[in-house]
Amino acid sequence: MTYIPKSDFMAVMMARGFMADCTDYQGLDEALLKGVQPAYIGFDATAKSLHVGSLIQIMMLRWFQKTGHKPLTLMGGGTTKVGDPSFRADERPLLGPEAIDDNIAGIKQVFSAYIDYSDAPTGALMLNNAEWLDNLNYLDFLRDIGRHFSINRMLSFESVKSRLDREQSLSFLEFNYMILQAYDFMELYRRYGCILQLGGSDQWGNIVNGIDLTRRVIDGEVYGLTSPLLTTSDGKKMGKSQSGAVWLNADMFSPYEFWQFWRNTTDADVGRFLKLYTELPLDECERLGALAGSEINAAKITLANEVTTLLHGAEAAATAAQTARDVFEKGGVGDDLPTLTLSAEDVAQGISIVQLIVKSGLANSGKEAKRLIAENGAKMDDAPLTNAGLMIDAAALQSPIKLSAGKKRHAMVQLG
């Protein structure tokens, strides 16, 4: 991309690696020079927390605000009832209103760590598309909105085409998601003057639909900008750790686990992740990313500290770093290790070490836990576990025990 940006936001997006594509580079750039502009990202409420795969979009909104503009975080209280089919191999399970509301409440906790929701001109707004989608009249919607969409064109979008090419069913319900998301963009332009939708590159088709609809119905000049769908240097999708999803809510993935996830970054990804997930100056990101050998570990600790501070605060980051030092350098336990608390009833008949490894989050299944033990990858209180049939009773838990999977993942087990 040879375009040289004039606005601060576009300059940051391009310099730090956030930019995958834009519907009109020059048009958006010039619009952002005209004063405070609103932009939005939509987040469907399919779980009680977002995971780290959404963090690149949250950072885009943070930079949008830091460069003088107004972020809109749109909760999909309406669209979650339908489900986004983009690049999915199957249909999402449908959630009821109560589950969606509970999920929205959980997701909201994350945003205030990154975005200011004050009454300032650039203060963010938290919105819910159920406000306008829940009360739509179906026949009116078909007549006024549906006529602007070409089925031929919608079938050509890669997100739909890839599903159909695999001969996997795409329900009419899911197909309508694209129309509803397009309607969201138009409604946000009408209500708030929102000129920009941000999203991952898998949302390109949905974003383009919204731009076309807004121009056709109310002659609004709006834009779309997408970020790359991130994978690690070894081809793995961002959002997963060895123990499962990397959630952003502390009650679902502890600050220590979050810190450790970033500390375990592959050497080749350090520089790129520093640019995307921290606010360190670019030259410092490049310097740290260029370190080699044992020196790269210092860069990984900086990455873990910076990202954890943004989400969970400086105190939580410092505690996580200290716990890591206690565990890895001093052979101790640490105050912030993930902890599984069992009741006396849980261990009345004894509980197998395999179950404990799974319950503590160190393995996703009994099969994986047994493999860890068989391959000498599991330890209890730093002693190798060799017996997958070992039973743990209340007497063994009079003092907390430390379980380890490999060198980097640890958890405490205690009686409550």
UniProtKB/Swiss-Prot annotation:
Residues 351-415 form the S4 RNA-binding domain. Gene3D superfamilies: HUPs, RNA-binding S4 domain, Tyrosyl-Transfer RNA Synthetase. GO terms for cellular component: cytosol. GO terms for molecular function: ATP binding; RNA binding; tyrosine-tRNA ligase activity. A motif ('HIGH' region) lies at residues 45-54. A motif ('KMSKS' region) lies at residues 237-241. It is an enzyme of class 6 (ligase). It is found in: Cytoplasm. Its EC number is 6.1.1.1. GO terms for biological process: tyrosyl-tRNA aminoacylation. ATP binds at K240. InterPro entries: aa-tRNA-synth_Ic, Rossmann-like_a/b/a_fold, S4_RNA-bd_sf, Tyr-tRNA-ligase, Tyr-tRNA-ligase_bac-type, Tyr-tRNA-ligase_bac_1. Keywords: Aminoacyl-tRNA synthetase, ATP-binding, Cytoplasm, Ligase, Nucleotide-binding, Protein biosynthesis, RNA-binding. L-tyrosine binds at Y40, Y177, Q181. Its main location: cytoplasm. PANTHER family: TYROSINE--TRNA LIGASE, MITOCHONDRIAL, TYROSYL-TRNA SYNTHETASE. Catalyzes the attachment of tyrosine to tRNA(Tyr) in a two-step reaction: tyrosine is first activated by ATP to form Tyr-AMP and then transferred to the acceptor end of tRNA(Tyr). Belongs to the class-I aminoacyl-tRNA synthetase family. TyrS type 1 subfamily. Homodimer. This is Tyrosine--tRNA ligase.
